[in-house]
């Protein structure tokens, strides 16, 4: 609900920082993710559409914010100064030329990579047709475009997630759990004071979901093996449901 968030921020003079880390090329209501807020954050982690191996980028249209960010990433040194002037405390978060060159090549290949991954996700989704009673799958609403970061599956029955994980392991298909609810399922944020159960829907996704890769270098054989494994694991869930 970005319109509502931006409206509240404007009313109370707040800054909107968009977490666009895994949303390269994604759209919300026809508008690219990253265009809504005052600042947008992108990650160049190795699994993302554009990768530098590590690192990331912050984008903004505000020149003052850009100067502060550029200063902060370089030990707090005054941006564009030839002297060692430090008006603020900063960190060392500068990307080296080697990493940047890898990222620039990724930018030049962006849409080829994006479209190839979208194609693979579509194949995975087609393999899951008929199993909508078992799980929720990666979907797109009208006017929205998902970033093809991975193919997500969230089980509707808590007992099914282990079946899918075990079947994936059997055929050596790598999977990762869905991201847990930050305030209640990550120990690092326990000081926020929330107890398990405060965010039941988010916690369900964290406990009962997983995602698998859709890397653009997957071969036809790789994709076929994943589809076969998806069908087998979801079929086992359906059979258990009927017992």
Where are these regions (language model features)?
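PLP-dependent aminotransferase class I/II
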Residues: 1-4, 11, 27, 63-243
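C-terminal EAL-domain catalytic cores of bacterial cyclic di-GMP phosphodiesterases
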Residues: 8-12, 16-18
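A short, conserved beta-strand element in the Rossmann-like catalytic core
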Residues: 15, 21, 217
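Hydrophobic residues in well-ordered beta-strands that form the structural core
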Residues: 16-18, 42, 60, 177
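Conserved active-site segment immediately N-terminal to the catalytic lysine
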Residues: 18-52, 81-85
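Active-site PLP attachment segment
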Residues: 35-74, 97
